[in-house]
């Protein structure tokens, strides 16, 4: 039986434990470990109390993990105690790394010269703590002022900074250290594939997977995780290379049953696809209930200025009339949440921004404003192309609270854009 190397993650920080700051390191580290073929046994979040951090390290060690990855607690302040705790856990003396101290001093001097001239020696003394490391550990040069460390042992402990902008660039160097390579030497090499679906319920996918388990030999060799994210289903499958034929058979079954909903077999997100489809085009958005969320999503990608011309948030009826040229008679006859009005909003965006592509959204996100005819969650969408392409208009009833409805509306609009620009027959 093949036994893969096992790892645990300890995310530190009282602000994360209490929910004031979202944990961005734990999920990211989990994905990186899985990519390496290392089995993730545990992930915990604890506050800045040294006793609690040490308790988590001991729990991981008693669980038999080969590698522990920590994040946070590497700063110069009194509550940054992770390094001291790790040294005690690993039975190693704390020593001053003079070379590291000089590197940190150079970084501080550069920062102070540019932003905050002051008493450099006082700041240097305050940051000397960051150059104190467990004897025998390998230093990972800082991205900010906090160095990372890899402390060899059973288990090996990888100590990384808390800010994701510092942790993520440090990861590759941490993995390449001799201590880390030795700790994960027994890893199993996996392939990982991501499928994305839109317009399919989780229960519908679950039924297909049950049928696959009953009909595809070797199905249980696949490790499948499904997640509902932004109104879409993300299905991640990990498998050893010798069972690739099982994954191929599963993918074919999903194509046969859910070909209209399966929009990505290589992990590409709808945002990536739309960026490609908008090459050579110009788009503008007109939004009411989403208040600019669609425009924000379209501009999340670097380089989006090549195809995004602008956006209008026409929240009130007056704004729809004055900014987008919507006929007041349409609003009076059909209401602001209606297909005729949302089509007029899209047409107004085409004209106002002189573009060839427009998307418009108007809806009732709640918690008030719903009626028997148009309950909360009623949202109208239009994607309009000025160069003879299809105009797609839909009215949907979306579930959830105000935030859910607004986010799902944005996702629906993205997929309507995808369909209009790719001119596919299967429109949600």
From Swiss-Prot:
Domain of life: Bacteria
Matches recorded under InterPro entries: CinA, CinA-like_C, CinA_C, Competence-induced_CinA, MoaB/Mog-like_dom_sf, MoaB/Mog_dom
Cystine pairings recorded for this chain: none
One Pfam family recorded for the sequence: CinA
Stored HAMAP family: CinA_B
Protein family according to the UniProt entry: Belongs to the CinA family.
Protein name: CinA-like protein
Source lineage: Bacteria, Bacillati, Actinomycetota, Actinomycetes, Mycobacteriales
Gene giving rise to this polypeptide: cinA
């Amino acid at each position: 039986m093949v036994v893969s190397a096992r790892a645990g993650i300890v995310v530190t920080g009282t602000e994360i434990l209490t929910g004031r700051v979202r944990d961005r390191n734990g999920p990211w580290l989990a994905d990186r470990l899985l990519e390496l073929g290392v089995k993730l046994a545990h992930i915990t979040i604890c506050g800045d109390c040294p006793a609690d951090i040490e308790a988590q390290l001991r729990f991981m060690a008693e669980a038999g993990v080969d590698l522990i990855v920590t994040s946070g607690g590497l700063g110069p302040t009194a509550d940054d105690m992770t390094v001291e705790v790790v040294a005690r856990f690993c039975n190693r003396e704390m020593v001053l790394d003079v070379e590291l101290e000089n590197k940190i001093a150079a970084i501080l001097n550069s920062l102070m010269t540019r932003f905050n001239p002051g008493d450099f020696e006082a700041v240097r003394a305050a940051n000397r703590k960051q150059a104190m490391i467990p004897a025998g550990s390998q230093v990972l040069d800082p991205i900010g002022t906090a160095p990372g460390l890899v402390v060899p042992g059973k288990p090996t402990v990888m100590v990384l900074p808390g800010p994701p902008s510092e942790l993520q660039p440090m990861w590759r160097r941490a993995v390449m250290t001799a201590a880390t390579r030795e700790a994960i030497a027994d890893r199993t090499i996996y392939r990982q594939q991501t499928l994305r679906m839109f317009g399919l319920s989780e229960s519908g996918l679950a039924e297909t997977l049950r049928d696959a388990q009953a009909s595809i030999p070797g199905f249980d060799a696949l490790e499948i995780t499904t997640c509902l994210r932004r109104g879409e289903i993300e299905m991640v499958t990990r498998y050893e290379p010798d069972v690739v034929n099982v994954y191929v058979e599963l993918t074919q079954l999903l194509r046969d049953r859910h070909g209209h909903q399966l929009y990505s077999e290589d992990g590409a997100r709808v945002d990536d696809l739309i960026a490609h489809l908008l090459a050579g085009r110009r788009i503008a958005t007109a939004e009411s209930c989403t208040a600019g969320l669609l425009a924000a999503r379209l501009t999340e990608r670097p380089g989006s200025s090549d195809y995004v011309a602008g956006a209008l948030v026409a929240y009130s009826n007056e704004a729809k009339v004055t900014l987008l040229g919507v006929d007041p008679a349409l609003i009076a006859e059909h209401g602001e949440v209606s297909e005729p009005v949302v089509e007029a909003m899209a047409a107004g965006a085409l004209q106002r921004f002189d573009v060839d592509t427009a998307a418009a959204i108007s809806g009732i996100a709640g918690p008030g404003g719903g009626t028997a005819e148009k309950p909360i969650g009623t949202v109208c969408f239009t994607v309009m192309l000025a160069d003879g392409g299809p105009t797609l208009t839909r009215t949907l009833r979306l579930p959830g609270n105000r935030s859910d409805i607004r986010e799902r509306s944005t996702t629906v609009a993205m997929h309507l854009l995808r369909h209009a620009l790719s001119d596919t027959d299967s429109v949600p």
